């Protein structure tokens, strides 16, 4: 599962409303992420624009929703928020340093790197705040990542010690 709290809440809301909600200003970019994955569809119902989730998907979501899914959503949310913060501060991080920092901050080893990368790739696409590149991860506002990487190499300074003071639930 690549869901974080924001995306989980939207799907939960749609599932709680029999698979359909009015399209109330959900950005086109965010809706496209769900549409590309064939989770949600746009339509018109009684003359009103709606987002629709097929009954089959609603049923699967409802049957899977529980403490295990909530735990995964919480973990994913933590990873995504930490990634946004780290890349806002550092700009660019190679995968080795990034993974080490994430494990240090969360106190958990990343057991499945493929799942980890899928979650972060999906979040990067959805939120547009960071991207996976040949060098690792970068903040989307960085135009010249080579320059940042070279600066990191020249500075020979350790990464600033972050803590996890935010409350994301």
List the predicted regions and their residue ranges.
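Helix N-cap and loop-to-helix transition residues
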Residues: 4-5, 54, 94, 109-112
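Phosphate/pyrophosphate-recognition segments in soluble nucleotide-handling domains
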Residues: 1-7, 55-81
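Intrinsically disordered or highly flexible coil/loop and linker segments, enriched in small
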Residues: 20, 40, 92-93, 126-129
